[in-house]
Regions:
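Active-site/ligand-binding-proximal alpha/beta "capping" segment
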Residues: 151-170
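Histidine-centered catalytic micro-motifs
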Residues: 170-179
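Catalytic cores of alpha/beta
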Residues: 124-129, 133, 178-189
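Alpha-helical segments flanking ligand/cofactor-binding loops in enzyme cores
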Residues: 3, 73, 100, 131, ...
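ATP-dependent carboxylate/acyl-activation modules
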Residues: 1-2, 18
Length: 189
């Protein structure tokens, strides 16, 4: 299927990182690095993307800066082009080391904003954090709506405000949890 996917014309394929690393080791008893190299061999025309938990790398606890830097270096050396870096609380301090490491390795450092609802999460909040992300050196921003909370008209407002505030590309990643993802994508464009 990789050969067919590579011909579609996707900007990138998120095929590694996050839970896939853990699942390869724990459940499939496979080497996740070997799996990544196989993806790289198969995707000749499509960028490979990974999900990276900031200072937690792919794990569930924080790691030292030198470990983060080395993991990014090895990820790029084994085929990753785009590193989608996030912190579930949008704490940018947990993203800085990974962004610097990705830039040092000439990979695209994409920061994923963990979208959520609540009184604190105003349009001004999202604009401010997007500006700080751009200043940090990220190459792009992804609005990561992992719970499917972003509604269509809110997507129009949010994407519009971010496009006005920053010069780097903006992507949207949403889940179909609430059944409105297709309309959210439509209104975000």
């Amino acid at each position: 299927i990789v050969d067919k996917m590579d011909k579609v014309g996707y900007h990138s394929v998120e095929c590694w990182g996050g839970a896939t690393f853990d699942a390869s080791l724990r459940f499939l008893h496979e080497d996740p690095w070997s799996r990544l190299r196989k993806f790289r061999d198969g995707f000749k025309n499509t960028k490979l993307q990974m999900l990276f938990r900031g200072q937690n790398i792919l794990g569930y606890r924080p790691y030292a800066d030198d470990v983060v830097e080395y993991f990014v270096k090895k990820s790029v050396a084994n085929g990753i082009d785009i590193i989608r870096i996030f912190d579930c609380l949008n704490d940018l301090r947990n993203l800085q080391t990974a962004v610097k490491a990705a830039n040092a390795e000439k990979a695209e450092a994409q920061i994923a904003l963990s979208y959520t609802l609540g009184d604190a999460y105003t349009l001004d909040y999202w604009v401010d954090i997007a500006k700080r992300i751009e200043d940090m050196g990220a190459n792009s921003i992804c609005i990561k709506d992992m719970a499917g909370l972003l509604l269509p008209y809110k997507a129009t407002e949010l994407v519009g405000a971010l496009k006005e505030a920053v010069d780097i590309p903006i992507q949207l990643h949403t889940h179909y949890t609430s059944g409105v993802a297709s309309m959210t994508y439509l209104k975000a464009v």
